[in-house]
Curated annotation (Swiss-Prot):
UniProt name for this protein: 3,4-dihydroxyphenylacetaldehyde synthase
Any one annotated GO CC term: cytoplasm
A single MF term (Gene Ontology): pyridoxal phosphate binding
Catalytic activity: L-dopa + O2 + H2O + H(+) = 3,4-dihydroxyphenylacetaldehyde + H2O2 + NH4(+) + CO2
Tissue expression notes: Highly expressed in the cuticle and midgut. Low expression in the head and thorax.
Statement: the UniProt record of this protein carries the keyword Lyase: yes
Keyword set, alphabetical order: Catecholamine metabolism, Cuticle, Lyase, Pyridoxal phosphate
Length: 521
């Protein structure tokens, strides 16, 4: 096969599995961020493809020398930045098997098990998450689920489906308008706390996306949506879709579906719910309050690769009425047709997505869920939440800090006083590369996000992270071992300038940071 025979394949494959196993077991020994500069790889790899191939041992050696040093270690328990991109040993096996099978399952006939396993897995996941039954593929409803690549992809698809449904309806309601005129008046809504993918979906879908202001708790309320819709209707626009978020990117806030849902349903406004991260918590009865009002949504998405131990990419998406997406996306060429199409238990998923070809993602989902079981999944999610609560206790016990919000496995906090404190602290932590956090804003203030992530986070990892935060805070504020402030720098407020750093712009004086509890001399 190509330039590798079966024996070499087995040897290379075993070496690769051994590397991954050792890498994950010993990942705590590595700095979570790489020590490379932009363009480092251009100096290491040739500019052109080699004329003759190398043996796998040479390639594996170069992989270790050239590729691994450029990694940010997302599976490290010291990765506390973005929402996690988790994996598990069972998922890795499933991904490997799917790659070896090489299935392209855009229709049932292309590989029946690829389609049927996906239908079953989407019901398994929906039942695990205690979703309203109207979203499941069952005899008494029109619902159904599909695996997409990412939340971004799912949101974009929801916007496109809502757009096409609205255009069909509006052409009947407004025969005096051309289709082009109707499309030019479409408008969509989301919170200013939603993921950037929502705003991007408006750009790609050629729909004006209004970012509505959330309240002081970063929650979008029904009255805010109502006001915006009424303003737009008065200006001759046509509201199409509201994209709500359960678990915002910055602070994991939850839009109020109990207020938003009824208004959307009463005003022919498609309601899509992005629960990319927080959706995993639906499997826990104690967090059922998060999804109140979800039954009023027309579609929703949840990333298994964030918190259900399936590796990237794998996003579950459900529709209350699956016919809506097939009506919007169906393009049926003769070479794609087969005699079994149209069966509810064997959908042609090519009609449920943007691209034609699709991967056998349901295989890694099945292997992961069957290996772990629902009980173990719930246990691990609860454990991750307890780790975040442990970190929160550390923060609250230190009077220099304040917790701005804490929910699920995310803690948002800051140093009291001016934003300059927290900005410089985060800058110093990122430069050291021992743990990795990113910033957000909350009520106009700069905050630090501490996220539980990695393949196997433990209590000692929380101790390690807190010690890093505390020690860097001590250095920043000039605190000795007894907790006394020994900072004697002369602070010059008049000579302020801004400089670039890994977390944005920070304000500094030439004499050092201007501390909020001290007056500049």
């Amino acid at each position: 096969m190509a330039n590798m025979d079966i024996d070499e394949f087995k040897e290379f494959g075993k070496a690769a599995i051994d590397f991954v196993a050792d890498y994950l077991v010993n990942i705590r020994d590595r700095d979570v961020l790489p020590s490379v500069e932009p363009g480092y790889l251009h100096d290491l790899l040739p500019n052109e493809i080699p004329e003759k191939g190398d043996d796998w041992k040479t390639i594996m050696e170069e992989f270790k020398r050239f590729i691994v040093p450029g990694l940010t270690h997302w599976q490290s328990p010291h990765f506390h930045a973005f929402y996690p991109s988790q994996t598990s040993y069972s998922s890795i096996v499933g991904e490997t098997l799917a790659a070896g099978l090489g299935v392209v399952g855009f229709s049932w006939i292309c590989s029946p098990v690829c389609t049927e396993l996906e239908v079953i897995m989407m019901n398994w996941i929906g039942q695990l998450l205690n979703l309203p039954r109207c979203f499941l593929n069952c005899d008494e409803g029109n619902g159904g689920g599909v695996i997409q690549g990412s939340a971004s992809e799912s949101i974009f698809i929801a916007v496109l489906v809502a757009r096409e449904q609205a255009v069909r309806r509006l052409k009947n309601e407004h025969p005096e308008l051309t289709e082009a005129e109707i499309r030019g008046r479409l408008v969509a809504y989301t919170s200013d706390q939603s993921n950037s993918a929502v705003e991007k979906s408006g750009i790609l879908g050629a729909i004006k996306m209004r970012l509505l202001p959330a309240d002081d708790d970063c929650v979008l309320r029904g009255r805010t949506l109502k006001k915006a819709v009424e303003e737009d209707k008065a200006n001759g626009l046509f509201p199409v879709i509201m994209v709500a978020t359960l678990g915002t990117t910055g602070t994991c806030a939850y839009d109020n579906l109990e207020e938003i849902g009824p208004y959307c349903n009463d005003n022919k406004l498609w309601l899509h719910v992005d629960a990319a991260y927080a959706g995993a918590s639906f499997c826990l009865p104690e967090y059922a309050w998060i999804k109140k009002g979800l039954e009023m949504a027309d579609s929703l998405n949840f990333n298994l690769h964030k918190w259900l131990f399936v590796n990237f990419d794998c996003c579950a998406m459900w529709f209350k009425d699956a016919a809506m997406i097939t009506e919007a996306f169906s393009v049926d060429r003769i070479y794609l047709q087969h005699k079994f199409q149209g069966m509810s238990k064997a959908p042609d998923y090519r009609h449920w997505q943007i691209q034609l070809g699709r991967r056998f993602r349901s295989l890694k989902v099945w292997i992961t869920l069957k290996t772990m079981g629902a009980e173990k999944i719930r246990e691990l999610i609860r454990f991750h939440i307890s780790l975040a609560q442990k970190f929160e206790q550390y923060v609250r016990a230190d009077p220099r800090f304040e917790v701005t919000s804490s929910t699920l496995a995310l803690v948002c906090f800051r140093l009291k006083g001016e934003d300059t404190y927290s900005k410089q602290l985060l800058d110093n932590i990122v430069k050291r590369k021992k743990i990795y956090m990113i910033p957000a804003t909350y009520q106009g203030k700069f905050i630090l996000r501490f996220m539980i992530a990695g393949i196997d986070p433990q209590a000692e990892d929380i101790d390690y992270a807190w010690n890093e935060v505390k020690s860097q805070t001590d250095l920043l504020l000039g605190v000795d071992d007894n907790g006394n402030n020994v900072c004697s720098k002369k602070l010059i407020k008049e000579e302020i300038f801004e400089k670039d750093n890994p977390v944005g712009k920070i304000t500094e004086s030439l004499g050092g940071l201007v501390l909020a509890n001290e007056k500049a001399q």
